Regions:
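C-terminal scaffold of the Radical SAM
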Residues: 1-282, 336-342
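A short, conserved structural fragment
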Residues: 296-306
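Solvent-exposed, charged/polar functional surfaces in cytosolic regulatory/catalytic domains
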Residues: 14, 18, 294, 324
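Short amphipathic alpha-helical interaction segments
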Residues: 280-296
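Minor-groove-contacting beta-hairpin "wing" of winged helix-turn-helix DNA-binding domains
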Residues: 307-311
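Short amphipathic alpha-helical segments
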Residues: 253, 257, 268, 287-290, ...
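Short, amphipathic alpha-helical interaction segments positioned at domain boundaries
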Residues: 313-342
Length: 342
């Protein structure tokens, strides 16, 4: 929504010229409520968008000032109402926990407002403070960031308040109303997760456009260059602006299926994996099983001959459980350990 109305019309016209868009498809757009008015929302509906994600982060003024993003409840509510009036069938709100000056009390007030607004979906993302990579974060005072314990308390609060309000806890960071397609897909075992979040469209190719965007086509990923100058230069020379890519190995695909199952359904059928990938699970994942046993002692999961099952206590930490099967992270840890020895 940083584009003007004319630019948005031109963009969607070009997309429709080159691609056949299904009449019953899902067409989603992420919106900054500070930059959008009712006329823009009406235009988006006219152009075919039917899903909207509203960036909120937090409604607490002190937190907003600390991250240099002041946004009133009224601005958000106005856009949300306009989306409903223009026929958007699903509206999502994005929150972030771990921001400077956040605490359980302030975030509880934000949750109360969000519950009152009653979006169809919510995402609650963990703030990653990486000032070396993101220049705007250098203005944030690290001393004002909540501790790890405080962040866990905020997440626990969010899970409790939202489930009490009738939302289904979809996974690591998503919530949805029981009749929302995400919740239905999870109940039916069709839920999928990609690098952008949860989706009802498993195994679909994803084509991305623009700087730094990531595409997923079949068993491969590729990422575009990170600067506009380089992006335009490559396009002007008839070259795809791809910076790097990877083709997944059979081992990558096996591990991806396990990570998907854990993050989407909180359980993995060992027997199904052995049949699909022709492996002996205990021998193939001996090192990983040792790590899982430690997590089992902490009550995070149950592991037997047939299933890996994430327990309620482990749902908040399902990312850490899934990371056990990421061989690239495991290799990084081994290299770090070797470096320390040297």
């Amino acid at each position: 929504t940083f584009l003007s109305h004319d630019e948005m019309r031109q963009l969607m016209g070009s997309i429709r010229e080159h691609f056949r868009l299904l009449p019953n498809g899902e067409y989603s757009i992420e919106v900054d409520p500070r930059k959008v008015d009712e006329a823009t929302v009406a235009l988006l509906g006219e152009l075919g968008f039917n899903r909207m994600s509203l960036g909120v982060q937090d409604f607490d003024l002190a937190v907003q000032e600390a991250v240099n993003r002041v946004q009133s409840i009224e601005e958000t509510e106005s856009v949300l109402r306009a989306a409903r009036a223009n026929g958007f069938k699903s509206i999502s709100v994005d929150l972030i926990y771990g921001l400077p000056k956040q605490n359980v009390i302030s975030f509880n007030r934000t949750l109360e407002e969000v519950i009152r607004l009653s979006p169809d979906r919510l995402s609650i993302y963990n703030y990653a403070h990486l000032p070396s990579l993101f220049k705007p974060q250098r203005r944030i005072a690290e001393a004002e960031l909540p501790t790890a314990d405080a962040k866990l308390q905020i997440l626990q609060l969010a899970i409790r308040r939202l489930t009490e309000a009738g939302y289904v806890y979809i996974g690591m960071d998503h919530f949805a109303k029981p009749d929302d397609e995400l919740a239905v897909a999870q109940r039916q075992g069709r839920l999928h997760r990609n690098f952008q979040g949860y989706s009802t469209h498993a195994e679909c190719d994803m084509m991305s456009f623009g700087i730094s965007s990531i595409s997923m086509v079949g068993p491969s990923y590729c990422q575009n260059v990170k600067t506009l100058d380089e992006y335009y230069d490559r396009l002007d020379n008839g070259v795809l602006p791809v910076m790097r890519g990877i083709e997944l190995t059979p081992d990558d695909l096996l591990r991806r299926s396990i990570i998907q199952a854990l993050m989407c359904h909180f359980e993995v059928s060992i027997e199904a994996l052995e049949v699909a990938h022709l492996i002996d699970f205990k021998r193939y994942f001996a090192a990983e099983i040792a790590d899982l046993r430690e997590m089992e002692k902490g009550g995070l999961l149950r592991l037997d001959d047939r299933w890996i099952s994430v327990q309620p206590r482990g749902r908040m930490l399902v990312r850490a459980i899934a990371m056990v099967f990421d061989r690239y992270l495991r290799a990084d840890r081994e290299r770090a350990r070797y470096s320390k020895v040297i």
